[in-house]
Amino acid sequence: MASTSTSANGGSTNASIVSQPVVFTTQTQYPLPYQKYMIPTTWRRYQLSQLVNKALSLVKPVPFDFLIKGEIIRGSLAEWCSEHGVGEEETLEIEYIESVMPPQKMSEIPHEDWVSSVSCQLPRYFLTASYDGNLRAFDLSKNLTASIPAHPAPITSLCLVSSSLLDDNSQQIVIASASHDLTARLTQVALNPMASTNESKAMASLHLHTAPVSSISANAAGTHVLTASWDGLIGYWDATVPSTDEVPEPALNERDRSKKRRRVEEGEVKAKRKAPLSVFKSHTARVSKVLFASGAGETAYSCGFDSTVRRWDTETGVCSHTITASEKPFLDMALTPDGNSALATSTDRSMTLYDLRSSTTILTSASNTYMHPSTPSCVATSATNSHQVVTGAYDGVVRIWDLRSPKSAMATFKPWSGSGQKVLSVDWKRGIVGVGGERGLEMWKVGEEQKV
């Protein structure tokens, strides 16, 4: 319809321009008073963002993105209305959100072998696990502060169990790792920013699984860990170190006994062999991911190649709820900060959002599906924005998503100079996304700049 329309500079024009009645809503710290605007249908994100900034009289401009019915506007209002069959008389409710600033590469740290897992959870450090069996810690200046030969086979997963500050200003941390060697391990590391080398100690090896261990995670208190394996089992463990072995060593031949005697004579400290507190049995194929829900750790979630997402009571070891998808072998999973939803990536090139509060056990509990051009191998959620997640894929692309807009990613970037090398792991903390893969480790600044 022809009407007086708002201009991008805050004035108005009487020219005969097709306009659409619009009201704006937001959940940000920049709300507008409720008011109906007549917006030219030729406008796109940039003009809408200018309007909101001028209406709010913001001293420092804040870029916004805009959503209609949960979908981010990528073109003009006219294009959106035409695609969705919306008439000129219909009032549009448009939600605005703060834009994701273009990701900026911070640094790159090559590794000799694939980086299968990366953690940004420890302030001022990045932790990596590699197919060469080593755990590594790097500071913000890219200095290698610790290198630990934790496993004799590729490491698949790591997590930070606990961290404490010592009197000499160093940090004592415990890292849990999982490996193709059928074990998981707890390793203690002292990180001193003033020391050229840092000490590590093998605390315990976790013995249960009969196939590669694919995932390990710790609860928030650092008192318990979970392991998941290709054997379909999930192990539930406490993080204490026993005084003696809880699992006997396998029988050794004469050659192995000689090697063991040499290690003892050289003073090598042997990790204690731990047994699980309980074993969770319900998956019918490989378990690819297991993690604790937020809180005290009474609840855990897992996903696997049997196309299921399962909820567990850690005290009883009972599977209390199962979401079954159709032919979706799951590779990775993350929980939203509120704990109400799970995001699971699959070999069918999708990431699916599941409502964990739903009582249904079938695919109808899926809220949205986010398609990728290549298999998304990993996913991590933002700690500060409940709507934003990051995925890494086998096409070598990292994608930043807003969960309210499933059609396309908010931003993308290609690590390792766009070489197309597979991304195997991502983590997101304090505005930094760590990316691990075939070419090593890269760190990218994503979102609001925060103190690292």
UniProtKB/Swiss-Prot annotation:
WD repeats lie at residues 110-148, 150-195, 208-247, 282-322, 325-364, 371-411, 418-452. Residues 252-269 have a biased composition (Basic and acidic residues). Residues 17-98 are annotated as: Ubiquitin-like (UBL) domain. GO terms for molecular function: ribonucleoprotein complex binding. It comes from the Eukaryota. Its main location: nucleus. One of its GO terms (biological process) is maturation of 5.8S rRNA from tricistronic rRNA transcript (SSU-rRNA, 5.8S rRNA, LSU-rRNA). GO terms for cellular component: nucleolus; nucleoplasm; preribosome, large subunit precursor. Keywords: Nucleus, Repeat, Ribosome biogenesis, rRNA processing, WD repeat. It is found in: Nucleus, Nucleolus; Nucleus, Nucleoplasm. Pfam families: NLE, WD40. InterPro entries: NLE, WD40/YVTN_repeat-like_dom_sf, WD40_repeat_CS, WD40_repeat_dom_sf, WD40_rpt, WDR12/Ytm1. Residues 245-269 are annotated as: Disordered. The keyword Zinc-finger does not apply. Belongs to the WD repeat WDR12/YTM1 family. Component of the NOP7 complex, which is required for maturation of the 25S and 5.8S ribosomal RNAs and formation of the 60S ribosome. Component of the NOP7 complex, composed of ERB1, NOP7 and YTM1. The complex is held together by ERB1, which interacts with NOP7 via its N-terminal domain and with YTM1 via a high-affinity interaction between the seven-bladed beta-propeller domains of the 2 proteins. The NOP7 complex associates with the 66S pre-ribosome. Interacts (via UBL domain) with MDN1 (via VWFA/MIDAS domain). This is Ribosome biogenesis protein YTM1. It comes from Laccaria bicolor (strain S238N-H82 / ATCC MYA-4686) (Bicoloured deceiver).
